[in-house]
């Protein structure tokens, strides 16, 4: 029989009414001030309630909790656990490890709950070295047989890909807990081992919503669409998380139209969307260019906001609306939404600048100039957008200026995507020799996208010699892209060199290459695919001369 568990003894405890009514940081600070005035800061029990509220129950108060924690000379382990738990559960759990180090420096001994929180943070961040170090501490402190700690270890090792260690921990005692089953299933699915994940899922004695959602999400991440759909149809107790897994999974796998179809099923089933649903749907509309559905979603957001203090009015939703309108070509609407956002952050500016780059390049550059006037500090994404705008509007001199500005004024080191945008800009303008010299002078190794972009420009302007050189560079990097051969063949054909066309076709047949899968910033017809590459988090190319 699988037992239900909680991760902390304080999870369901009854709290004094004063703290139950503390719902915002302003009230929290008022209570803190009253405690100081009345000399209660030496009472660890009362201070613990304050720290608990700041860490776990008051939205946006975690930094305040850290500040309070720093001011307590001798916290007990319970107070430390409140702060660790809050940090581990937050969107940015990086501070959890340093908080644990501070706890040790103050001479506070950890308990079994302490390690569940730090291991959760290491799992979320996939910090293998830190997690292994904490595994060692667990052994030294004698908590390795504790059921909660063991589940946390299984979660950490499974999520970080150490499935052998996770399997060793997944013994009879661990199998009594559904958390351990879900962790193992998710770990195998995340690493693409769907058959093993499915085997565990089928063996699972009790499948709750979490287990079903984990398995469906795992299949979608591995692009096992049929398996995901089969599981989804079998599951009879779907919640909003289940629907979101399917909708976002289909969008991420390149099936935005099907994602909208699943949303219709969701509404027909009587399930109401949440913020995750809306974000995924707006992304689907942006990919499809489905302006009408995007407008209906916008109306739904506004109607929801008018009747309640809804989560839909947060910055991520406004950013997604701006992105959707810009990518659907509704520039005025995108700017209108942007102007209406009261709490703009850098991502709001970037969303508009990047979104306008393809369809309204002048507007993108104007927004960047406005951003500078308002002293909003740009980042790497900002400059991808503004250089791309210069590329699509033929503003080569301005593009050069912004590339230099990025390094000289803002101390942002260009990455491979900035270099790719510059090559794209010079290539579109027909300045092929300068584009070539720019590639040769790059401080990091050019990747296939850079060379393919130069090759695409050579095709447009009929530069056979430079095209051959770019193609040789591409083939030396990988020999399985037929698109590279097609581009070179087209260069020969455009200049009437039919013997060259025949040579390329023979090379193509001899190497038996695959169909094209790469991207050329110039040749790529689908601008949205290009944007997904530029804004993806793909690993950077190596620095020249660097040994890895």
Curated annotation (Swiss-Prot):
Ranges annotated as spanning the membrane: none
Pfam families attached to this UniProt entry: E_motif, PPR, PPR_2
Any one GO molecular-function label of the UniProt entry: RNA binding
InterPro entries: E_motif (IPR046848), Pentatricopeptide_rpt (IPR002885), PPR_At4g14850-like_plant (IPR046960), TPR-like_helical_dom_sf (IPR011990)
Record's keyword annotation contains rRNA processing: no
Stretches forming PPR repeats: 76-110, 111-145, 146-176, 177-211, 212-238, 239-273, 274-308, 314-348, 349-378, 379-409, 415-445
Entry similarity comment: Belongs to the PPR family. PCMP-E subfamily.
Highest classification ranks of the organism: Eukaryota, Viridiplantae, Streptophyta, Embryophyta, Tracheophyta
Region annotation (Type E motif) ranges: 450-525
Gene3D superfamilies per UniProt: Tetratricopeptide repeat domain
Biological process, per Gene Ontology: RNA modification
Presence of the UniProt keyword Repeat in the record: yes
Record-given protein name: Pentatricopeptide repeat-containing protein At5g15300
Keyword annotations: Repeat
